[in-house]
């Protein structure tokens, strides 16, 4: 969002925010206005955020859900906020579920140490949509800048992948599990590239698992350019060392 629009949003009266956002939401359409939602998250007051989270309107609910991430940072002792985002991570609307992951990323942008235990808790949730939000939130390159968060991302990928292997075949076909599998189809590559040594070891262990969904996850990640480059670099380095040993 450019500066002009930022200033414009800040100047909108609270009682006019809903129609303002809805008119510029990009919905219905293939892509909602994420930049506008980010700006709302950065400036909205608590009451407006909590009001929007409860609305039926998809975009306003999206905006409110994402903005709770800032409230979690500002009010770390209020456990009800992370619980609310957790409920939205299992929302019927896919955009709202995505907003829950974005809310956690807002937390991570400010406080990685606050993000990590939330992800660790969510990835053990019985609802696959919540597990998906946890993995998608932490497997974001801009957040994987310190050893503890990189390790947390790999651990989240491992636990979420393992959770699929314990399910019967009929349950694996549900939309939530399919959504989780799809996320793991790219999140592993992000986590591995962020921490190549530990990541490649974990990914090799994953490749050894004899499970159809795990094989799909592995194959999907191997198609990602970021991981293919990492593998090429690793193989080149290994070949060089072998030649030197000769």
For the regions a language model picked out, list residue spans one by one:
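Residue-level detector of extended alpha-helical repeat arrays and alpha-solenoid scaffolds
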Residues: 29-33, 61, 97, 131, ...
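N-terminal alpha-helical scaffold/docking segments in eukaryotic complex subunits
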Residues: 1-74, 216-246
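Amphipathic alpha-helical scaffolding segments comprising HEAT/armadillo-like alpha-solenoid repeats
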Residues: 11-22, 41-53, 74-87, 109-122, ...
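Acidic, Ser/Thr- and Gly/Pro-rich intrinsically disordered linkers and low-complexity segments
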Residues: 162-181
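Hydrophobic alpha-helical segments and helix pairs
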Residues: 65-111
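Alpha-solenoid repeat junctions
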Residues: 40, 44, 68-73, 104-111, ...
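Short inter-helical turns and helix N-cap capping residues of alpha-solenoid HEAT/ARM repeat scaffolds
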Residues: 29, 56-57, 92-93, 126-127, ...
């Amino acid at each position: 969002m450019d500066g002009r629009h930022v200033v414009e949003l800040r100047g909108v009266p609270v009682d006019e925010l809903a129609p303002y956002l809805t008119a510029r939401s990009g919905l219905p359409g293939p892509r909602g206005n994420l930049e506008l939602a980010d700006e709302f998250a950065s400036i909205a007051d608590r009451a407006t955020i909590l009001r929007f989270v409860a609305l039926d309107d998809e975009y306003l609910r999206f905006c409110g859900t994402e903005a709770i991430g800032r409230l979690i940072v500002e009010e770390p002792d209020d456990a009800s906020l992370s619980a609310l985002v957790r409920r939205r991570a299992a929302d019927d609307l896919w955009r709202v579920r995505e907003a829950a992951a974005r809310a956690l990323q807002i937390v991570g942008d400010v406080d990685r140490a606050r993000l990590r235990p939330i992800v660790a808790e969510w990835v053990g949730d019985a609802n696959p949509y919540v597990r998906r939000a946890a993995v998608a939130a932490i497997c974001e390159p801009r957040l994987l800048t310190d050893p503890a968060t990189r390790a947390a991302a790999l651990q989240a990928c491992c636990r979420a992948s393992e959770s699929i292997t314990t399910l019967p075949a009929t349950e694996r076909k549900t939309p939530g599990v399919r959504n989780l599998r799809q996320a793991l189809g790219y999140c592993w590559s992000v986590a591995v590239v962020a921490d190549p040594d530990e990541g490649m070891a974990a990914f090799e262990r994953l490749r050894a698992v004899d499970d159809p969904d795990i094989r799909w996850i592995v194959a999907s990640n191997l198609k990602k350019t970021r991981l293919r480059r990492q593998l090429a670099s690793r193989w080149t380095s290994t070949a060089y060392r072998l030649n030197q040993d000769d």
